């Protein structure tokens, strides 16, 4: 275990300063800390130690100045401050601590073996004493699936954090201990926010692929999320013991579908039920797992004869791929020189950290084979916290970008990336980017500048916790008693920094909900408030017209899980209405308007005139408001009210009451009254002009189109295609494998309700599908007509009441 006091040693000075040898540093440190042993030291030793102390104190002052200089450079000119300069100016003790840390996530398509793989990692690192399966017969379940729902359904719903220590045996026989903060993420698209917030704070990731299916739909989504946050990754091809396993097909798909250079760093010894182990292409040695749970690693110099030709070919392909992304290997390749083991490892690390390459490992987690070599790959090829560039925004300098420096002595900066309710209150997960977070310290929420005290700091192990007194830069922890929202930034008050927010997708499905019993209303409200705080993609709104509470989310499963959690955790049974699609409205043609709002009845009246036009925008996803007033016919404050009216009108369109997209409004003239004009008048006039012009423009209803991927056994291909055609799906591509096929299609969300039960019936329960929002497009004329009539009827019924 690391000594907390060592982490507080000052940083060394800018490169070039003379430093004490490590032995003398330790002596100095002990001399300072252990005053109680002073009587035991020789009197003659005092001057010598004093000399050392004087030199060390000088270094402390220089180091403090160096750290301050680095911080100033990070704020004033972040582009000029390289990550190498930050690393070079780390204190040796601090540099060693950070070099031994890996913050990683496990991400993949559904059922690729993420949680099973994580369970093996925890077992081999000694974090758990026994292996339990995701759908285990012992009613225990995998450690990282701590929710009852997760264990019942066999899926991961929430990302779960843990930590472990991996002892890696180096090539020279030395053993080095590394600290790994690990987050296991869900694979289902409905819980994509869990992957987003995990990748937002991690330094690296393990992307798991199925040896049979290769790159699947959610693999592509995960790849996109990793690119969004610049997360380096290694790849692990799992399920090598399955029938039809073809790891090199998966490697080819990483190259072709994900468009990232990839090459195998291992070759399997056997496949399917004859899978024995792997050949390491870097060291050219065979690796096997022995023991009841594969805990014993056996390394042999002999490479089996049956794979020698494949090993030679794949090593050549590895070197060629590296030559395309790394200059040093390129020079050796052109000179026809064979790179050494050290050169290959260094090149793979450089290219992986530089987001140019992903090394591919192979194994089978369920059969306990080749997981440990993948763990070695995490250490060898994924970055430590000091090697990753992290930026913040300086609120005091108009949100200019600043570079965060992972020094413990710097002012604290952290990000709350996940909230969870526990038996002890709200649990807030925090990534510390700079400085040190200490128990009892006061920190400031950058969003509202509210000061909060940190009463407890814990390290999480799924649903268990271990209390600590402080956490240094580059680490992940959880704190109790901090009232905040997901995505809030925290500082110690010295810096006005805030972190960039994570990407939060818009909900695509809604349904009405209410408690069956009125006596449950209080618990119902508590549950709604908690779920919204924890999950940014879960929205709760109240529709005044229908007098209904609506919940919105990423899919049917997403909302079903929250309804079930409400029943279990809050004992609230709910009634729900049919699913409602998040339709949108858009303008048709350019329409000019000249609208006058005039109400004068003796007292203060309303007067506002707005003139201009409305038209479609270039991009459907956005709305635009512009003013082109010449001569001051409308004052600035009234124009601000006009923009507010435009935004309010876009929130609820006049066609079917849904949000408006792709509409531009321009006001170029108007008129005011000396006494009767007000901000309210211009806001209302703009809304009225909007509604009138919108309805005259031949508007349309837009419906969400879902990128749908269906996989099923080959004998059901005709039935699946027929199912999709009945739903007016546009089939974009079809892939046929050895015993299964995959269909890629665009389907309207409205047409996909109930699809899962029909798919199960058509494929004898063997088919599966995923949906992800793709884009909005015009709904079919008949559907538009039905939606408009339904909306008008609801409006008429409401007015009758």
From Swiss-Prot:
Pathway: Protein biosynthesis; polypeptide chain elongation. CDD domains: EF-G, EFG_III, EFG_mtEFG1_IV, mtEFG1_II_like. It comes from the Eukaryota. One of its GO terms (cellular component) is mitochondrion. It is found in: Mitochondrion. GTP binds at residues 108-115, 184-188, 238-241. Residues 1-24 form a transit peptide. GO terms for molecular function: GTP binding; GTPase activity; translation elongation factor activity. Keywords: Elongation factor, GTP-binding, Mitochondrion, Nucleotide-binding, Protein biosynthesis, Transit peptide. Residues 99-386 form the tr-type G domain. One of its GO terms (biological process) is mitochondrial translational elongation. InterPro entries: EFG_II, EFG_III, EFG_III/V, EFG_IV, EFG_V-like, EFTu-like_2, G_TR_CS, P-loop_NTPase. It holds the Pfam family EFG_III. Belongs to the TRAFAC class translation factor GTPase superfamily. Classic translation factor GTPase family. EF-G/EF-2 subfamily. Mitochondrial GTPase that catalyzes the GTP-dependent ribosomal translocation step during translation elongation. During this step, the ribosome changes from the pre-translocational (PRE) to the post-translocational (POST) state as the newly formed A-site-bound peptidyl-tRNA and P-site-bound deacylated tRNA move to the P and E sites, respectively. Catalyzes the coordinated movement of the two tRNA molecules, the mRNA and conformational changes in the ribosome. This is Elongation factor G, mitochondrial. It comes from Aspergillus clavatus (strain ATCC 1007 / CBS 513.65 / DSM 816 / NCTC 3887 / NRRL 1 / QM 1276 / 107). The gene is mef1.
